[in-house]
């Protein structure tokens, strides 16, 4: 599952002018140093349901109610899967790796989640984190043998008012096999019901950023 996290970061050892304001912002995905971050995840397209999501820092889809989705007055219920199925964002890994999901990274190209692809500097609720090492917690609704988890983050100078693409992303962490070194099918490592990864946020990130978390499974052609 692909998980998108919106974060506000505060650099360790620095007094950031906007810190008081940003500390009042609610978690969206992850907060880093002086950076606001969003997180999203990609799931398994061969199943009728996907199998995992980033729970902390809270991902864009998991934080649906705070982001305006729901069944109540004034809330957006036009795409119910966003409200009921945070683990449902999924696509074949090759679509991500060949750039076919550019502009649709948060939804993984799924029409039923397309409103997650909206991208402006103010659209999404944000989480506060610091630069340096941070924990990322996944919740697995179904377990798979796994090749790796990988984490990307928007680069310094990215455009927060344009659709998200992998060209705007930098790889900041891998848990498991190096990219391009998949294990034979069925020989990946098994995950637990929850997985927590310690990922280092680069020291040069300030303001609003997005983190993109990907779970590359080993027993199908897909990623979450």
Feature-to-residue mapping (PLM):
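Bacterial N-terminal signal peptides that target proteins for export
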Residues: 21-30
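Exoplasmic/lumenal beta-rich domain surfaces
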Residues: 157-195
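Internal, hydrophobic beta-strand segments that form the core of beta-sheet-rich folds
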Residues: 150, 154, 205-220
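N-terminal "mature-chain" segments and other terminal, solvent-exposed stretches
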Residues: 48-162
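C-terminal segment of classical bacterial N-terminal signal peptides
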Residues: 36-47
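Short, Lys/Arg-enriched N-terminal segments with co-localized hydrophobic residues
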Residues: 1-21, 46-48
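Exposed beta-sheet edge/beta-hairpin loop segments within beta-rich domains
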Residues: 126-131, 136, 140-142, 182-207
């Amino acid at each position: 599952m692909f998980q998108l996290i919106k974060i506000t970061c505060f650099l360790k050892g620095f007094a950031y002018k906007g810190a008081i304001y940003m500390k009042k912002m609610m978690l969206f995905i992850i907060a880093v140093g002086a950076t606001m971050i969003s997180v999203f995840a990609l799931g398994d397209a061969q199943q009728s349901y996907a199998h995992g999501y980033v729970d902390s820092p809270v991902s864009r889809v998991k934080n649906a109610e705070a982001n305006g989705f729901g069944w109540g007055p004034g809330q957006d219920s036009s795409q119910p899967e966003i409200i009921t199925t945070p683990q449902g964002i999924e696509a074949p890994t090759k679509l991500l790796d060949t750039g076919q999901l550019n502009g649709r990274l948060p939804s993984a190209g799924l029409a039923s989640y397309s409103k997650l692809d909206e991208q402006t500097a103010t659209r999404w609720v944000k989480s506060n984190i610091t630069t340096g090492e941070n924990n990322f917690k996944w919740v697995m609704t179904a377990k798979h043998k796994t090749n790796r988890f990988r984490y990307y983050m928007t680069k310094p100078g990215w455009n927060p008012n344009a659709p998200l693409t992998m060209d705007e992303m930098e790889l900041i962490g891998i848990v498991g096999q190096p990219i391009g070194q998949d294990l034979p099918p069925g020989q990946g490592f098994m995950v637990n019901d929850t997985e927590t990864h310690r990922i280092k946020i680069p020291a040069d990130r300030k303001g609003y950023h997005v983190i993109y978390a990907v779970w590359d499974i080993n027993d199908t052609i897909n990623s979450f």
